A protein has these predicted regions:
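Secretory targeting signals
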Residues: 1-3
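N-terminal export signals
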Residues: 7-26
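Short, glycine-/small- and polar/acidic-enriched structural segments
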Residues: 27-154, 160-161, 179, 185, ...
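Structured segments of extracytoplasmic/periplasmic soluble domains
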Residues: 48, 74, 129, 147-151, ...
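Short, solvent-exposed loop/beta-turn-alpha elements that line the ligand-binding surface or hinge
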Residues: 53-57, 211-217, 287-295
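Pocket-lining segment of extracytoplasmic ligand-binding domains
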Residues: 87-89, 168-171, 175-265
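Secondary-structure end/capping motifs
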Residues: 234-308
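Conserved C-terminal helix/tail region of periplasmic/extracytoplasmic solute-binding proteins
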Residues: 299-325
């Protein structure tokens, strides 16, 4: 069917009368949705999505997944193309046949040990203690168990209770007689503030990342999470991903210079108040590092996980093609 000038003008007039400009159709931006985790690096993504250059050419949106299981389901269904993920989950998905690869790392260690009353100052002091851990068999649990195994601490002598989410862990921690909880930022800072309201003192325990570095003789960093992407989607949008990398780097610089404003943005996405987000920025060890630039550290982390439990990676280490950027 062809359209002459008179028909085009009639359609334009009708669209205008309906409050729709024909130019809107020509200017429609491609959707670029990033599925973020309920943790601090999503603040970096949120700022990049609102202030970055990519937003000028694409409709950049951030949506938060609630649990690693929802993340896995989103990837398996094909709905999730760009997503923040615990660093082991990307490998696991790839080894299950999902065509995903790693784009970057956004935190070098986001998990904190929060203690009730008195600080637990060493991993050895966890013996005999009641500890809350969210996300069984995912990153907080993995780091704790691998560290204890490396230090020859019997995991059966630590009383671990699992919570479905960090938010649930906070509620249980404050209401029940747990000695400590392992929480990602900003939920670690949120529990400090919530505890004050109910008259409980919460303090930070030993630094998990530093203890990890000493135990495994590595740099004091754990490449815990970053952005992974569908390979085909990445290959078709390499220019956009380069812009995203610059936007994320600029966003992190802006966040550290404008913490209060950054917390206001983050509170729109995370289950934590602005004050907790602002307080938790330092402990989140935020970074924006391309996967290829941190490849040695990432592979060393994966090798540690393989020794601890190969199932965490789906049974094998990733190939070089896993590192997309």
């Amino acid at each position: 069917m062809t359209m002459n000038r008179r028909d085009f003008l009639r359609m334009s007039a009708a669209l205008t009368a309906a409050g729709m400009s024909p130019s809107l159709f020509a200017a429609t931006k491609e959707q670029f949705t990033i599925y973020g985790a309920p943790a601090m690096p999503s603040v970096t993504i949120a700022v990049a999505a609102t202030q970055g250059k990519l937003a000028k050419q694409a409709d950049v949106a951030l949506e938060i997944w609630r649990s690693p299981d929802q993340l896995r389901a989103g990837v398996a269904s094909g709905q999730f193309k760009v997503m923040m993920s615990p660093s082991n989950v990307g490998v696991n998905l790839r080894n299950q046949g999902q065509q995903v690869g790693m784009v970057n790392i956004l935190t070098n260690g986001i998990t904190q040990l929060m203690c009730k009353g008195r600080a637990i100052t060493s991993p050895q002091e966890l013996v005999g203690k009641k500890i809350l851990v969210p996300f069984k068999n995912d990153m907080p649990d993995i780091v704790l168990q691998a560290l204890l195994k490396k230090l020859n601490i019997d995991i059966n002598k630590v009383d671990i209770t699992y919570a479905a989410t960090p938010t649930e862990a906070i509620g249980l921690f404050l209401l029940k007689d747990f000695h400590a909880a392992i929480l990602p930022e900003p939920m670690a800072s949120a529990v400090v503030q919530k505890a004050k309201i109910v008259g409980t003192e919460i303090v930070r325990g030993f630094d998990l990342v530093k203890e990890w570095g000493q135990a495994f003789n590595t740099k004091p960093l754990i490449p815990m999470a970053g952005i992974i992407a569908n390979e085909e989607y990445f290959d078709a949008h390499k220019t956009q991903f380069e812009l995203l990398h610059q936007d994320l780097s600029d966003a992190l610089n802006w966040i550290m210079a404008n913490r209060k404003s950054a917390a206001e943005i983050g509170a729109n996405y995370l289950p934590a108040p602005e004050a907790a987000i602002e307080m938790g920025l330092d402990g989140a060890r935020l970074t924006v590092t391309k996967a290829s630039e941190l490849k040695n550290e990432i592979m060393q982390f994966y090798e540690t996980l393989m020794e601890f439990n190969p199932k965490l990676l789906g049974g094998k280490l990733p190939d070089d093609k896993f590192f997309l950027a």
